[in-house]
Amino acid sequence: MLRSTVSKASLKICRHFHRESIPYDKTIKNLLLPKDTKVIFQGFTGKQGTFHASISQEYGTNVVGGTNPKKAGQTHLGQPVFASVKDAIKETGATASAIFVPPPIAAAAIKESIEAEIPLAVCITEGIPQHDMLYIAEMLQTQDKTRLVGPNCPGIINPATKVRIGIQPPKIFQAGKIGIISRSGTLTYEAVQQTTKTDLGQSLVIGMGGDAFPGTDFIDALKLFLEDETTEGIIMLGEIGGKAEIEAAQFLKEYNFSRSKPMPVASFIAGTVAGQMKGVRMGHSGAIVEGSGTDAESKKQALRDVGVAVVESPGYLGQALLDQFAKFK
């Protein structure tokens, strides 16, 4: 477990550590996943690392190796195993890392990626101590080389370039024009299914994860999507807890819906019933109703007020986007 001394003031800053312009903002572009992305796996030879590295290889992702200090010098899935991320980058030119290691050492694995200055680190691990992630948040905000997705997330995938870094089921994805950002893994797949079914497809799908200190949040993804030439519409999937969706609504009001031709945005917010259970954590560490603005109804209303098409069931996301495309045509 990582140790750091963190004040209450630092805690407040880190919960929203990339709202102001800081060096870390420069790494948002690292989320794009071009075809030449070279991926390594931390925890490469473990059961989950092996399983998902193999699926990514079959999908078309360029997996160039991985790390396991105890097996450095060996070959796994036809690729070399290295002692460290730094060694892997030096030998393979890796530009992204998928982190599949147990919770007690996951923050240390993220720290290693940051120190090695790999452009993109995607941490799938659930159950990382929040104090450890607060330490990582402080590291991230002072550097401009590494972008983190997660932890506790399904990962990130670009169907057009066939770059998959995570645990997503590849068969449901279709290259297209909708950018998806989600706090929930299963809701992500429902949104993907909806956009595939309506033939809208996906440009980039980011699972930000449900923990309290995500490396990439809604506004980071929205900044990327609004400037990305391959993205023409957005799906935002939120849930109870925190005020990230409220902040995203204000961002969309200022930077999207004020445009002469806004980008269509649809959203689903999970946890309507949970709003009656204040102070109770619902699954994710960040999914807890703490007061005004953190419940599902407040978030849905904030999004509706700025022009987002908010649906009551994820099964309506595809049609909601089609309606928005017609509206803004």
Curated annotation (Swiss-Prot):
Give the residues annotated as coiled coil.
none
Q: Name one GO biological process term.
A: succinyl-CoA catabolic process
Query: Catalytic center at which residues?
Result: H284 (tele-phosphohistidine intermediate)
Which residues does the record give as CoA binding sites?
T45, G46, K47, Q48, K71, I124, T125, E126
Enzymatic reactions? succinate + ATP + CoA = succinyl-CoA + ADP + phosphate
Q: Where does substrate bind?
A: Y189
Has UniProt tagged this entry with the keyword Nucleotide-binding? yes
User: Which GO cellular component terms are attached?
Assistant: mitochondrial nucleoid; mitochondrion; succinate-CoA ligase complex (ADP-forming)
Which residues are the transit peptide here? 1-24
Main subcellular localisation: mitochondrion
Q: In which pathway does it act?
A: Carbohydrate metabolism; tricarboxylic acid cycle; succinate from succinyl-CoA (ligase route): step 1/1
What keywords does the record list, in alphabetical order?
Ligase, Mitochondrion, Nucleotide-binding, Transit peptide, Tricarboxylic acid cycle
- This enzyme's EC code(s): 6.2.1.5
Induction section of the entry: Induced during growth on nonfermentable carbon sources and repressed during growth on glucose.
**Signal peptide range:** none
Looking up SMART domains in the UniProt record yields:
CoA_binding
**SUPFAM superfamilies found in the cross-reference section:** NAD(P)-binding Rossmann-fold domains, Succinyl-CoA synthetase domains
So what does this one do?
Answer: Succinyl-CoA synthetase functions in the citric acid cycle (TCA), coupling the hydrolysis of succinyl-CoA to the synthesis of ATP and thus represents the only step of substrate-level phosphorylation in the TCA. The alpha subunit of the enzyme binds the substrates coenzyme A and phosphate, while succinate binding and nucleotide specificity is provided by the beta subunit.
Please tell me what else the database record remarks about this protein.
Present with 18400 molecules/cell in log phase SD medium.
The family database entries (HAMAP family) matched by this protein are listed as: Succ_CoA_alpha
NCBIfam families assigned to the protein according to its UniProt record, in alphabetical order: PRK05678.1
Summary of subunit composition and partner proteins: Heterodimer of an alpha and a beta subunit.
Name it.
Answer: Succinate--CoA ligase [ADP-forming] subunit alpha, mitochondrial
Organism listed in the record: Saccharomyces cerevisiae (strain ATCC 204508 / S288c)
Instruction: Write the lineage as a comma-separated list.
Output: Eukaryota, Fungi, Dikarya, Ascomycota, Saccharomycotina
